[in-house]
Amino acid sequence: MKTFVLFVILLCLTFLSISKSETCPFSQSLVSGASATYYTDPNAGNCGYENLMGPLGPGNLFIAALGPNLYNNGKNCGQCFNISSPYTNRSVVIMATDSCPDSGYCQRSSHFDLSTQAFDVLGAQSIGVLEGLTYYKVPCGVNGNVKIMMKDGSNDYWTAFLIYNSKVTIKDVSVKITGKSTYTSLTQSSYNYWISPNMVPGSFDVRIESVGGEFIYITIPKVESRKQYETSSQFSVDGCVGTPSGPSGGLGSPSTGASIGTPSDASSLTLYALFSLTILFLVMLN
């Protein structure tokens, strides 16, 4: 009987561990064959963060402009990536803050146009184009809670929202106007603002949904051009590999997640756990 109870306890602990490993809100599959160039004026990128050292930016210059495939019409704005290089055997964590629409290298399926600070970690600028890079997505270790700003020119009948300081990318933003019972989903623009063309005077509720399906709510008293608010919470990234920590969210840190390697596949982990428990059970029976 004691053997059976021990087996059940081990089984429960194993599946609790498996469940935790599956909670990362986005895929962390390792991607190979990426390339990178660099550019020298990374401020005022297409994602709307303006000055990178300002209140909307990441607070450092370790950023990238993404080619059209990765940029995906703004859906990867604010996503952080861990990029590894065979030239230096080092890796760097960057945040996507801009798009790279050039007709050359940026048209590749996985291309990063990096700030010089990020590029220098991966290779010498004299090389020009770095080939054979690998990367995977990681959470951004930002400080504080998710924030929201209303675009300049916003008024009682039209506004647009920028969601920033989030550990993960945003799947949807919706608004419930005073007197209404339902939320209305907004359209994300290619410059990363969520457009609301049907506002009315007065307070309203905003619902922010992460790429992992988690929600954050905030009530805003009125539309006010360039007014910024901090929500009361941050999205969870439990179970993600290579979660940055410390000031600036680990951006630019060559050691952040650099030795993690390819994240484990959940189904493989499950099979491995079941196999291990079966062997353990047979040993205990003997």
UniProtKB/Swiss-Prot annotation:
Keyword check for Iron, yes or no: no
The cross-references to InterPro entries, in alphabetical order and at most eight, read: Expansin/allergen_DPBB_dom (IPR007112), Expansin_CBD_sf (IPR036749), Expansin_CellWall (IPR051477), Expansin_EXLX1-like (IPR049818), RlpA-like_DPBB (IPR009009), RlpA-like_sf (IPR036908)
* Extracellular domain ranges by topology: 22-265
Is the Zinc keyword given for this protein?
Answer: no
The places in or outside the cell where this protein is found are: Membrane
Q: Report TM segments.
A: 266-286
Q: In which domain of life is the source organism classified? A: Eukaryota
An example Gene Ontology CC term for this record: membrane
| Function summary | May serve to lubricate the movement of the cellulose microfibrils during cell growth and wall extension and/or they may serve to maintain the fluid state of the slug cell wall.
Name the record gives this protein: Expansin-like protein 1
What is the organism of origin for this protein? Dictyostelium discoideum
